[in-house]
């Protein structure tokens, strides 16, 4: 079985390889435990009368545990080279989920419309901060795993952001986007980059695909590559905004 195969592998492995294997199996057990805990919390969680009337899909409940388990699986899949691409959507722009586990008993979509209802801003900020915390969790998890001469984080690219800029105005321009990970040393991090004119979001996607050697010349509405992403690119620093 799997246990016998892993034991045989341990016996054959060198000391450094055994350390990697131990880290892998420890991570795997952590994922198993988190999934079991998420299931248990999902069965045992109690909700108030208002939430009890909602469609189960709209109650976040143990969303935190489920998201962490998914992120752990993504990290393990990258580390073992089971896949080199993953996508994880924490919420969509029309999300009706109630983040009850954080004390927010209103729809995410409702609190995103705050121009004429400032009272919902604390709830909206809390949800956005929680989403950002999941990115931080993913990054820190990837930094703990050795990958070649660096870490898994050093050799990966993480694109994080939203498909909409402002909930009230449904703005689709100047999207908030964070690019993390070293991309194997190809990406110049620690900057806030603004472009002098609008660029299709597809240009960013195409540029990242090219950095990863993906065989593509176009994606979505792309019109070309986006300058300034790679540390090797010729990019005028006048377009950089650190404020």
Where in this protein do the model-derived segments appear?
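Ligand-binding pockets and gating/stacking loops
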Residues: 1-243
